[in-house]
Design a protein with these regions (language model features):
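Charge-rich amphipathic alpha-helical interaction elements
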Residues: 1-106
């Protein structure tokens, strides 16, 4: 095998590993986004379940529900940034996977 052929063989192996790593990271990002979306749905369900309690209970319960609602709002705001970051990372990884595949075929 010529030196050039060996060089290209090594390059293709490295690119294949890079593509596999990019796909793995993409899978992890997608899983994180699914988890964040699931958490958002749970927060919405808790908020919906807490609303009937506001009219039925004393002022102390009202304060507790308001505190819970405030905490849920804070959690939802905290969810927005990681979700957006995960989406951006997912897009970057998709581009990296496509670029790696194009380099392999080039």
């Amino acid at each position: 095998m010529t030196a050039n052929a060996q060089r290209w063989k090594r390059i293709l192996k490295v690119r294949a590993v890079q593509r596999q790593l990019a796909e793995l990271q993409l899978h992890r990002c997608e899983k994180e986004v699914r988890n964040l979306v699931d958490l958002g749905h749970r927060i919405s369900a808790i908020r919906a379940a807490a609303q009937p309690l506001v009219g039925a209970q004393s002022g102390m319960m009202l304060r507790s529900v308001c505190e819970l609602s405030s905490r849920l709002d804070t959690a939802q705001r905290a969810l927005a940034t990681p979700s957006r970051n995960a989406q951006e990372a997912r897009n970057r990884q998709r581009h990296a996977v496509v670029a790696a595949r194009q380099r392999e075929t080039a």
